[in-house]
Swiss-Prot record:
Keyword presence, Transit peptide: no
Gene3D superfamilies: 3.60.21.10
Keywords noted in UniProt: Hydrolase
The protein's name: Bis(5'-nucleosyl)-tetraphosphatase, symmetrical
Organism of origin: Neisseria gonorrhoeae (strain ATCC 700825 / FA 1090)
Catalytic activity field: P(1),P(4)-bis(5'-adenosyl) tetraphosphate + H2O = 2 ADP + 2 H(+)
Pfam families, per database record: Metallophos
Amino acid sequence: MAHYAIGDIQGCFDELTALLGKIGFNHGTDTLWLTGDIVNRGPKSLETLQFCIRHENSVQIVLGNHDLYLLAVGCGEGALKRSDTIEPILKHPDGGKMLDWLRAQPLLIREGGRVMIHAGILPQWRIAKAESLAGEAEAELRGKKYVKFFSKMYGNKPAAWDEGLEGYARLRFIVNAFTRMRALTFKNELDFDYKSTVKKMPPYLRPWFKAPDRQNLDHTIIFGHWSSLGYTNADNVISLDTGALWGGQLTAVNLETEEITQVQAAGGIDWKSFAK
């Protein structure tokens, strides 16, 4: 029995199939964690989502920003863009059932000393606190007022955590931290503009996992989201988004041995085509 984690797939289903074949994944005995952003921009978002649903006994996902975007569009709180590849899901006869399944998925998974989240965990949040906050947002996602939740979800404010935050401002910050965070100011404020490498990061920012006051070093945090960061295994974090969507690799890590396995992506998105 082996336990693997794989980074952002974003509809790159052929690469996922090849990677599972390369590691010899067995749905009967092995388990798989996916770091979120299972859909969108890659060519086979529908097939990837169907795979996750079909194998839910062996595959666990956390929600990423693109998965939440699919849910928002699906309930009328978002508009499709030229770069999106989620329309086949929305038009599928079972599209509603697939969205209901996706909406029931967690933002955070903890098993023993490991935690999986899409983007990261705020440095000042202990793991128990992060679990509790994830539960607040998950309750809204799964509740009767989920459409209103999606109507209030988008926005970059508040930028900093305050325990006194309430209502949708509180929920928005929680979701932004878990699904969009990369860089922080030295006051632990979220910065959504910076998306490049750590080496090129301006001096007034730092990666969320490099904050000196981190309260969650007692767990290994597995995440994706930051493709320009690439594979990283340091500071009690394992970063797994290695840019399959952009012509990079799709990466799996054996969580017991920390051995990584990669497959080269077949192609990559040419964003110039979307600018025409």
